[in-house]
């Protein structure tokens, strides 16, 4: 759901570099296999998802061949998190939600018109799954209590940091102002 330290924060125990070395090795040694990365887009995905799209595209390009049953070497299957609601993209400020749209635009840029073995890039399905996250983010229901969920988010990251020995604000400096404002309020 992200890259580098932010991915390692959300997937505690993950070594980001080792993960990608293993994906690369897997695709190299098994040229008929397709890797499907299932990503649950959440409030912490916003800042590095575009970088993840770059990385997946790099692997698509490097490992494209005509031996695979599924055309692409690697697919990014993006879903959005609904529960727990305090980790949903709906808690974010509008400026952060715009980053979701930028990720969808990047996937569209890397998209392919024809899904054939001699092409590489993001399929229309991969692109649409990222686009719908933006629609979900801006389409906040009147039943969604943004203020309560933001408070619960702060409680969650504070408890997470205490238990794991991590530091949310250092890992996600883009959310420092959001964190401070919602911790007070």
Specify the residue positions occupied by each region the protein language model found.
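Radical SAM enzyme [4Fe-4S]-AdoMet core and its adjacent flexible, acidic
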Residues: 1-185
